[in-house]
Amino acid sequence: MSYGRPPPDVEGMTSLKVDNLTYRTSPDTLRRVFEKYGRVGDVYIPRDRYTKESRGFAFVRFHDKRDAEDAMDAMDGAVLDGRELRVQMARYGRPPDSHHSRRGPPPRRYGGGGYGRRSRSPRRRRRSRSRSRSRSRSRSRSRYSRSKSRSRTRSRSRSTSKSRSARRSKSKSSSVSRSRSRSRSRSRSRSPPPVSKREPKSRSRSKSPPESPEEEGAVSS
C-alpha cells in the first residue's frame, strides 16, 4: 500500500492497536498475518516525518468486530519478526495525515495516541523511573534504618540482660559469702571454750630441818 494516499473511510470499522513492532515490519506483512481472522479494511503504520522510520506500532482495521476480537485473542503475545506483539482494542479512530503536515513532527502524545493506550513520552518515563528509583531507595533506606534500630535495640536489651545477670550473680555470691560468714561466727560462738590443760605441779619434798642438840638430849633422856 502507498504511504502518500489519503486515509480510507474507517467509519464502522473496528481498530486494533499492535505494539512492539520492528522497524522492518511492513503493512503488507501485517495484512497477511491478520487477514487469517477476517476481512481487513486498512493497515496503518505511523512513521516519523523526517526519518520515515516506523514508530514501532500500527493499526489494523476490521470490517467485523468479531473478526477483530478473534485476531486480538490470537495475536496478542504472538511473535512477529522476532518481537512479541501486544494487541489491544484501539479507543479512537485514525487521525488524518494533515495532522502532522506543515507543522513539523507530530506531538509525542500522538505516538501512543488516540488509538489505544497512550504511550508515555520519554520524559514521563524518565520521571516515572526516577520516582520509582527514589521510592525504592527511600524504602531500602527506611528498611536499613529499621534493621539498624532493631539491631541496636537488640544489643541494648542483650547488654541490659547481661548487666542484670551479672548483678544477680554478684548479689548471689555476696549473699552466699555473708551467710557463710554468719554461720561460721555462729558456730564459733556456740562451741565451748577450750579447756586449758594444767600441768601437774611437781611435789616438792619438804626437807625437815635438822634437829637441834637440845632436842636430841631431851629425846635421849
From Swiss-Prot:
Extensively phosphorylated on serine residues in the RS domain. Phosphorylated by SRPK2 and this causes its redistribution from the nuclear speckle to nucleoplasm and controls cell fate decision in response to cisplatin treatment. KAT5/TIP60 inhibits its phosphorylation by preventing SRPK2 nuclear translocation. Acetylation on Lys-52 by KAT5/TIP60 promotes its proteasomal degradation. This effect is counterbalanced by HDAC6, which positively controls SRSF2 protein level by deacetylating it and preventing its proteasomal degradation. The modification Phosphothreonine is found at residues 22, 25. InterPro entries: Nucleotide-bd_a/b_plait_sf, RBD_domain_sf, RNA-bind/splicing_reg, RRM_dom, RRM_dom_euk. GO terms for cellular component: nuclear speck. Residues 212-221 have a biased composition (Acidic residues). Residues 14-92 form the RRM domain. The modification N6-acetyllysine is found at residue 52. Its main location: nucleus. GO terms for biological process: mRNA processing; RNA splicing. Keywords: Acetylation, mRNA processing, mRNA splicing, Nucleus, Phosphoprotein, RNA-binding. The keyword 4Fe-4S does not apply. Pfam families: RRM_1. Residues 92-221 are annotated as: Disordered. The modification N-acetylserine is found at residue 2. Necessary for the splicing of pre-mRNA. It is required for formation of the earliest ATP-dependent splicing complex and interacts with spliceosomal components bound to both the 5'- and 3'-splice sites during spliceosome assembly. It also is required for ATP-dependent interactions of both U1 and U2 snRNPs with pre-mRNA. Interacts with other spliceosomal components, via the RS domains, to form a bridge between the 5'- and 3'-splice site binding components, U1 snRNP and U2AF. Binds to purine-rich RNA sequences, either 5'-AGSAGAGTA-3' (S=C or G) or 5'-GTTCGAGTA-3'. PANTHER family: GLYCINE-RICH RNA-BINDING PROTEIN RZ1A, SC35-LIKE SPLICING FACTOR. This is Serine/arginine-rich splicing factor 2.
